[in-house]
Amino acid sequence: MEIRRRPPNPKVQVAHLEYAIPHQDGEPRNILEKIVWEKDREIETARQRMPLVQLKARVAELPPALDFLGALRQAPVAPAVIAEVKKASPSKGVIREDFDPVAIAKAYAAGGASCLSVLTDRTFFQGGFDVLVAVREAVDLPLLCKDFILSPHQLYQARAAGADAALLIAAILTDQDLAYLQKVAATLGLTVLVEVHDAAEMERILTLGGFPLIGINNRDLTSFETDLATTEALTQQFADRLRAQDAFLVSESGLFARADLNRVQRSGAGAVLVGEALMRQDNVEQGLRDLIAP
């Protein structure tokens, strides 16, 4: 799958005048490409509002990041649960009308989550870095910044807002981008959760190496359909190489019941990322307890 990129504001300089020029790419071919194009525009705006030098100053004042991967490996329950703070999604619209991220995060912590995932995309998921800041102030669990990360600037934003880990999606990044962003994340103390959906993406990640935490997204980001067989197929196909790299696997999306957790755990997933199933619960804490109960 190829996700096209394009400059957010294509312009040409003629003498002392600057002219905007129209894009030649037409319309985005799927929702993921639409998100990426919008994200490029958001990044350009964010760079102007908060220059990197200011973000670096904020990050320098922070205590060390928490050990996200360590929390998953040492979880008292199996599989470990990364519980997601998410108000909406492109496929489902608003998932929770009474969205109180602080109350939800505290309920997750009380219910047995090992780590939390916080959506920071505003346009498509109604999240934000302000939500991440609020959750960081409310709980002591390791936090994942869940976004469509394309630029080092976003990694600095994530760390400055209190994230301990960041998501990198293989489908929207080149190998060069993945390697570079991994290095930037390491300098910030951020754990990288690299996400794949198919065999080609898994092959790329294992060939690059250096990604001990791999997420298998059961959701096709071009159609937003889910299938737990995705985790089963990829873990079986790449079992030997995953074992050789001591990769810790997270199964993401489409997980609604304990039977689903058992299914992906049998395939080799050491953790699951669960959002919608919990966000739709009247009692989020009890919903999580019921989900992880053996």
UniProtKB/Swiss-Prot annotation:
PANTHER family: INDOLE-3-GLYCEROL-PHOSPHATE SYNTHASE (PTHR22854:SF2), TRYPTOPHAN BIOSYNTHESIS PROTEIN (PTHR22854)
Protein name as catalogued: Indole-3-glycerol phosphate synthase
Enzymatic reactions: 1-(2-carboxyphenylamino)-1-deoxy-D-ribulose 5-phosphate + H(+) = (1S,2R)-1-C-(indol-3-yl)glycerol 3-phosphate + CO2 + H2O
Gene Ontology MF terms: indole-3-glycerol-phosphate synthase activity; phosphoribosylanthranilate isomerase activity
Statement: the UniProt record of this protein carries the keyword Lyase: yes
Source organism (scientific name): Synechococcus sp. (strain WH7803)
GO-annotated biological processes: L-tryptophan biosynthetic process
Enzyme Commission number: 4.1.1.48
Record's keyword annotation contains Transmembrane: no
Family, per entry: Belongs to the TrpC family.
